[in-house]
C-alpha cells in the first residue's frame, strides 16, 4: 500500500463494490482506514516526517499497523491480496498474509508477478492464487455464492 499507486485505492474500491453487490460481504479497506488516521495531517508533511521527525512518523504508522492487524485477526473472514511489484518495497502486505495464514483465514492472492518472483512463503500461505480479478470473482462466487450468477 505504501508504495502502490494511490495506495491501491482503485482496485480495492472496485472489489469492495463487487463484494457488496454480489456476495453481500462487507470490507475492511486499509486505504480508507489510513485516510481516517491521516485526516488531521497533511500527507506531504507526514511523508517528510520519515526523515524529519521519525519518532512522530513511527507513532502514526504503529497506529495503522495495530488497526490493520486487528482487522485481519479479529474481523476478517478472509483476505484478498494483490501481489505485484509494489510489495517488494513494503512489509505490511507480507505481514497481513502471514497473520491471516497463522489465524486460519483464507487468503485469495491475485498474483501479478512471474511465478519465480513469487515468494515461496507467500505462495504457501495463499489458499487460492489467481492471475486477475475476474478469476478471483469466479473463485469467490463459487465459494460464497454457490456459483449463482453475478454481475
What are these regions (language model features)?
Residues 1-151:
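Conserved catalytic or regulatory cores that recognize and/or transform ribose-phosphate-containing ligands
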Amino acid at each position: 500500500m505504501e508504495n502502490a499507486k494511490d495506495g491501491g485505492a482503485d482496485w480495492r474500491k472496485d472489489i469492495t463494490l463487487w463484494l457488496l453487490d454480489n456476495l453481500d460481504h462487507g470490507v475492511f479497506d486499509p486505504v480508507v482506514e489510513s485516510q481516517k488516521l491521516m485526516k488531521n495531517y497533511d500527507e506531504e508533511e507526514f511523508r517528510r516526517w520519515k526523515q524529519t521527525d521519525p519518532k512522530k512518523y513511527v507513532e502514526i504508522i504503529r497506529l495503522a499497523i495495530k488497526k490493520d492487524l486487528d482487522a485481519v485477526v479479529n474481523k476478517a473472514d478472509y483476505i484478498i491480496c494483490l501481489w505485484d511489484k509494489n510489495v517488494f518495497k513494503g512489509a505490511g502486505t507480507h505481514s497481513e498474509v502471514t497473520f491471516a495464514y497463522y489465524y486460519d483465514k483464507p487468503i485469495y492472492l491475485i498474483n501479478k508477478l512471474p511465478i519465480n518472483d513469487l515468494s515461496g512463503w507467500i505462495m504457501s500461505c495463499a489458499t487460492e492464487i489467481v492471475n486477475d480479478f475476474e478469476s478471483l470473482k469466479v473463485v469467490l462466487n463459487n465459494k460464497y455464492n454457490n456459483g449463482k450468477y453475478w454481475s
